[in-house]
């Protein structure tokens, strides 16, 4: 089985990327992808989009240049309990795909046990589809525990 998609990408709306949705869709089509996920950063990351952006995503076409598009967010895990930086209602009503990750502007790095718990709690959240960059060397974690939790909850890493 071959998967031809990229589900963790950012546009200029996230504040640190350099392409528009249309430019990214064209590039994805040129590379032979079948599905592209545009997942802008949630609040807490300097320069990212406001909440209204996520409400407006529903007007963007879900197909460009022959590839399917999904729109979502890379939501910040903000504490050791796996709390998220976006309201559940906004997540449920506006996002096709939901990624959660630890970003140091929004999270105080703790012990291996604390950081692992933060990830596991986010993985156990039924609103989360994917965990972003759990391999960040600045954030010590128990990889085996996280992989087991992801497998049990059908969450991508």
PLM feature segments, named:
Residues 2, 29, 42, 47-155:
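Extended substrate/RNA-proximal surfaces in nucleic-acid metabolism proteins
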Residues 7, 39, 132:
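Single, functionally critical "micro-switch" positions that shape active/binding sites
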Residues 13-48:
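Metal-associated gating/positioning segment near the N- to mid-region
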């Amino acid at each position: 089985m071959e998967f031809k998609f990229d589900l963790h990408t950012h546009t200029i709306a996230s504040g640190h990327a350099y392409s528009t949705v249309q430019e990214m869709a064209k590039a994805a089509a040129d590379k032979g992808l079948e599905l592209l996920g545009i997942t802008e950063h949630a609040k807490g990351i300097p320069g990212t989009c406001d909440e209204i952006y996520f409400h407006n995503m529903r007007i963007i076409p879900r197909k460009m240049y022959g590839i399917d598009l999904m729109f979502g967010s890379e939501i910040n895990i903000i504490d050791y309990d796996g709390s998220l930086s976006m309201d559940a209602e906004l997540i449920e009503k506006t996002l096709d795909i939901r990624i959660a990750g630890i970003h140091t502007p929004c999270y105080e790095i703790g012990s291996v046990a604390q950081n692992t718990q933060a990830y596991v709690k986010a993985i156990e959240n039924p609103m989360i589809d994917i965990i972003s960059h759990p391999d960040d060397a600045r954030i010590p974690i128990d990889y085996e525990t996280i992989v087991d939790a992801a497998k049990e909850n059908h969450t991508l890493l």
